[in-house]
Swiss-Prot record:
The keyword Phosphoprotein applies. The modification Phosphoserine is found at residues 50, 146. Keywords: Acetylation, Phosphoprotein. The modification N6-acetyllysine is found at residue 108. This is Uncharacterized protein KIAA1143. Residues 43-56 have a biased composition (Acidic residues). It comes from Homo sapiens (Human). The keyword Phosphoprotein applies. It comes from the Eukaryota. Residues 23-63, 79-154 are annotated as: Disordered.
Length: 154
């Protein structure tokens, strides 16, 4: 049994004609188990992937107020600097959660204007409906069979 555990696969050497053919064609070897185990490098931390000069959008200035290429580059630099100042990444790589900043209640409702006129009639209607239902139940109850003394005598 112990000899079975010692069995391993040895890859034979590639023939010379295959090596020459692959070299002429430009064949690249696919990933192997060993290459898949290697940890890939993390991508750049910048989320802006269009930093290359040939991948930048074409800037066209039609009017006086339009942005020029230099102004766009300045704005991008300012945005990157602001992002760098806002959230420094922790050295150990852990994510830190923070509670959101609470705003005063005045700011919260400053833009909202709602009237309760629609709500009040609805509440009144609900109350009136419940009164009507109660009166209907009383009417139905009175029309039900009743066992009076007269019925008992017969």
């Amino acid at each position: 049994m112990s000899k079975r555990n010692q069995v391993s696969y040895v890859r034979p050497a590639e023939p010379a004609f295959l090596a020459r053919f692959k070299e002429r064609v430009g064949y690249r070897e696919g990933p192997t188990v060993e290459t898949k185990r290697i940890q890939p490098q993390p991508p750049d931390e910048d989320g802006d992937h269009s930093d290359k000069e040939d991948e930048q959008p074409q800037v066209v200035v039609l009017k006086k107020g339009d942005l020029s290429v230099e102004e766009v580059m300045k704005i991008k630099a300012e945005i990157k600097a602001a992002k760098a100042d806002e959230e420094p990444t922790p050295a150990d790589g852990r994510i830190i959660y923070r509670k959101p900043v609470k705003h005063p209640s005045d700011e919260k409702y400053s833009g909202l204007t709602a009237s309760s006129k629609k709500k009040k009639p609805n509440e009144d209607e609900v109350n009136q409906d419940s009164v009507k239902k109660n009166s209907q139940k009383q009417i139905k109850n009175s029309s039900l069979l009743s066992f009076d003394n007269e019925d008992e005598n017969e």
